[in-house]
A protein has these predicted regions:
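Membrane-interface helix-boundary motifs at transmembrane edges
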Residues: 1, 57-69, 117-125, 165-175
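N-terminal topogenic module of multi-pass integral membrane proteins
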Residues: 1-79, 83
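Hydrophobic cores of alpha-helical transmembrane segments in multi-pass inner/ER membrane proteins
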Residues: 47-58, 104-116, 156-162
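Juxtamembrane boundary at the C-terminal end of a transmembrane helix
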Residues: 183-194
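Hydrophobic core segments of alpha-helical transmembrane domains in multi-pass membrane transport
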Residues: 8-18, 135-139, 159-164, 180-184
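Membrane-proximal helix-loop-helix units in multi-pass membrane proteins
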Residues: 84-150
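Membrane-helix boundary connector in multi-pass membrane proteins
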Residues: 141-152, 158-174
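Membrane-interface helix termini and inter-helical loops of multi-pass transporters
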Residues: 25-35, 86-95, 192-194
Length: 194
């Protein structure tokens, strides 16, 4: 069963990579107005959706090792689909940019192992889930240069992250409370990365 899930993750990643590059390489006016207004072309080029997908793959895996393997294979297959489309359909291959994403994909192996514990019990699980929600919060809202929304889709992504990492009410309040300083620190350390 785990092998079937892993194959599904690989196929999903590859298809998402091809879809992302197809959207990215298509004129925006071919899409319905709603898709244009939601700015899906750029949404997939920012980090929030990938953080959310990696979190989902991690926390719903059977073990921390399986979370690492599935998340890593998702990102590698997504990059394969993205850059194969880029090379063979669009006729170019940005190697330096590709290498940056490959390095991030390797990092996800270790990060996913830790994220698997976010749905667990206790203080460590609350801290991990707070960090995830905080990073998603930092992707959705500006906290350091006035409070405003960066992008609507990132707000939706943050809200979905809250739903999947929801805990008992008392723990949930702590989780959300801790996520705010995480978001603030994130924006102070890497203000424009996302």
């Amino acid at each position: 069963m785990q092998m079937i899930v892993t194959v599904g993750v690989i196929l999903f990643g590859f298809a998402l990579g091809v879809l992302q590059k197809w959207i990215d390489g298509s004129p925006s006016n071919i899409f319905p107005l709603l898709i244009q207004q939601l700015d899906l072309r750029n949404y997939f080029g920012r980090f929030a959706i990938w953080i959310l997908l990696a979190t989902c793959i991690s926390i719903y895996s059977k073990s921390p090792l399986r979370a690492s393997i599935n998340t890593f294979l998702f990102f590698i297959s997504m990059l394969a689909g993205y850059y194969l489309y880029c090379n063979y359909v669009l006729g170019f291959l940005p190697k330096a940019y590709m290498m940056m994403w490959v390095m991030i994909s390797f990092a996800t192996f270790f990060i996913a192992y830790i994220c698997w514990y976010a749905k667990g019990e206790g203080v460590i699980a609350i801290i991990i889930s707070s960090a995830i929600i905080g990073v998603l919060f930092a992707q959705a809202f500006s906290l350091t240069q006035g409070f405003y929304v960066y992008h609507l889709m990132e707000v939706v992504t943050w809200f979905i992250g809250i739903i999947i990492l929801y805990r008992k009410p008392k723990e949930f309040v702590i989780e959300l409370g801790l996520s705010v300083p995480v978001a603030l620190i994130y924006q102070l350390v890497i203000p424009y990365w996302g």
